[in-house]
Amino acid sequence: MIKAVVGANWGDEGKGKITDMLAEKADIIVRFQGGANAGHTIVNDYGKFALHTLPSGVFYGHTTSVIGNGVALNIPVFFKEYNEVVSKGVPAPKILISDRAQMVMPYHILFDQYEEERLGGKSFGSTKSGIAPFYSDKYAKIGFQVNELFDEDRLKEKLASVCETKNVLLEHLYHKPLLNVDELFAELMEYKKMVAPYVCDVSLYLNNALKEGKEILLEGQLGTLKDPDHGIYPMVTSSSTLAAYGAIGAGVPPYEIQKIVVVSKAYSSAVGAGAFVSEIFGEEADELRRRGGDGGEYGATTGRPRRMGWYDCVASKYGCRLQGATDVAFTVLDVLGYLDEIPVCVAYDIDGEITTCLLYTSPSPRDTERS
């Protein structure tokens, strides 16, 4: 059976902790989307870890940790995390990497930085991890899958073609140094050495595991409100954050995802720009930020202070509905123990109209009938 652990809100709901708990009884843990742009914080007997690409099940010797085809795989970051985990006494995790996973290229990170610089005050608050440029290339069909590392002639030919296009942008739009094909090729050959022992047909592996009755856990990143289709667009991430995408990003049949655990925390937080109805400011926000999370509410990837707010029932109801929740894990209620009363947002007042729906346009009769 497959269970998915996903977020109801903007991310940072505590999915890592819930995944870590459920991993104790799982055989396989799969990352199926996203990349190193968001982190899951785990605290256990080995210490405190902020995992950006490694699945949260790496601390259990009986599990296999899998990178699915839907992941934006930053190979150096992945193996840096792997080595850090092992250096702290964790037994070397069993890992597998999909041959269809696409790689975050060095220039994706550069383009992410350059575009944020170009946009200035109109930027999206990117973590500068290369995620948007990565997915742009993936859907423009000029990305690089892991399996392409093993055909060096075709790889170099494709790399030269892609660099020609990228260099036009670097020269005329960003006014930055051009890419060197030989240097990039040499770097990709280092990537090949790193991943070679772990590459497999993950979809086939997971389908065989299901036939054997194995317990599989899909670990999602961020939350519903960051989904590119159903989130608060355009302040979203570039890959689907919904449990439904687990079937695509892991390569399993949709009907096998029988449990969807949606994680929501007792207050709200967000990293980056965008609408945040229940947001609080000043000393009120600072106190909640200090008390929250594991050592405070700061981004696991960027270290930036998270924007803080009270629990948003409207957004959370929407998030759970879109995820198809079969179960809800409610986290960090203990953090709010310093309050006499816990503020909660139960509806939105939009120009005098009260609504309990997360709306992008004016409500129609059909919208209100279904609220």
Protein language model features and the residues they cover:
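Basic, polar low-complexity surface loops/patches
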Residues: 1-98, 102-105, 329
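General beta-strand structural signal in soluble alpha/beta enzymes
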Residues: 5-7, 29-33, 51, 95-99, ...
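Conserved phosphate/anionic-ligand binding catalytic regions in large, soluble enzymes, centered on
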Residues: 6-18, 125-140, 215-250, 268-271, ...
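A glycine- and small-aliphatic-rich helix-loop capping segment at beta-alpha/alpha-beta transitions
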Residues: 21-26, 47-50, 111-119, 140-147, ...
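Catalytic or ion-translocation cores adjacent to nucleophile or general acid/base/metal-coordination motifs
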Residues: 26, 30-34, 236-262
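Internal alpha/beta core interface subdomains
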Residues: 78, 82-205, 216
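A glycine- and small/hydrophobic-rich beta-loop-beta segment
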Residues: 249-347, 355-359
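Conserved small/polar residues in nucleotide/adenosyl-binding loops
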Residues: 360-367
